[in-house]
Amino acid sequence: MKKSVNERVKEAMKEQGVDLLLITPSSDMVYLLGKCMMSDERLNVYVVPAEGRDFLFVNDVYGQEVAGWGIPETEVVTWKDGENAVSLLLEQLEKKRLPYGKIGIGASMPAGFLVPLQEAFARTRFVLHREILGWMRRYKNEQEQSLMEEACSRCTEALKAVMKAGSGWIGKTEGAFADALCREMEQRGISEAGALVCAGAQAAVPHYTGKDGIISADACLLVDFGGKYRGYCSDMSRTFYFYGGCGENDKRREFEAVYGIVLAALEAGQGAAVLGGRMEDVDNAARRVIAEAGYGKYFTHRTGHGIGIDTHEEPCAASGDKSVIEPGLAFSVEPGIYLPGKFGIRIEDQIFMTVNGAKVLHDYPRNEWLVCG
């Protein structure tokens, strides 16, 4: 019989000598429970012992909500405002006779919780649970693959809808484009929709977040966008060049040449995503293409990152990541060249590794970069 996620987590905890996991509201809680309450200044944790019954330790404000989740075999323990939550949590562990010599926590646990916990649990060793939950989350099952495929398909259709306006976007702001794209995603059932839209020279800043830049003729537009479908992410980038109606010119010729290099790097990176290879192979392959074309110093970030419940997860397509490429991994391949004061180009697709190899989840044409109509 196939083991549940909870059973596999507890097995991994025992193997690594971890007594407890303390899971604060985060994507880790979503992964384990399929639910998550709002994160605020109150200590709310899902307590997972290696041996024994799990329980939710939450402020009374969230007690009714959490009880309504109906999580089997999971007790809900509440505390009230004005009480010392850390002391009460320690009391619960003692009462339930749960060991806490080594506790695993997530990298996103706020310092405002961790420091008081370390002070109260003076003899406890706190460790990141990356080798338990992080490792498990990198391998997606068929259902997770299906949800990511649907997220990617819906986001792709949203971009196609927005780009129907073609050169009608000239003179509009980055913010107007981003708002329209997010509306299209939301209309297609995408939650947490977001878009970075970078016009002209702003595209040379890899994670530019402005909204006031103007989309111009004879200039580029870099669009990095995505969202979630039923909890799973799409992350995609495309770069366009808006035709100014003046025939070919030096700006367009330079853009086209650099675009071809980035596209070749993308294809090389995707080609290196083979079962049995290493994640760093993807980065090396893409980076080699750009370096050999003379633009190595303008490719300033890793080639890709894992994707799942979070937009950025493990593993990474980066130098030094020697993770073996195996079925179930999902990650981006997104090489870029950023020329300060001129333009930037990034092309990003999402990949899922099946038993037969890499499957690209976005189908927006990569060669449709010139916007004329």
Stretch-by-stretch model annotation:
Residues 1-373:
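Active-site neighborhoods and metal-handling regions in enzymes and metal-associated proteins
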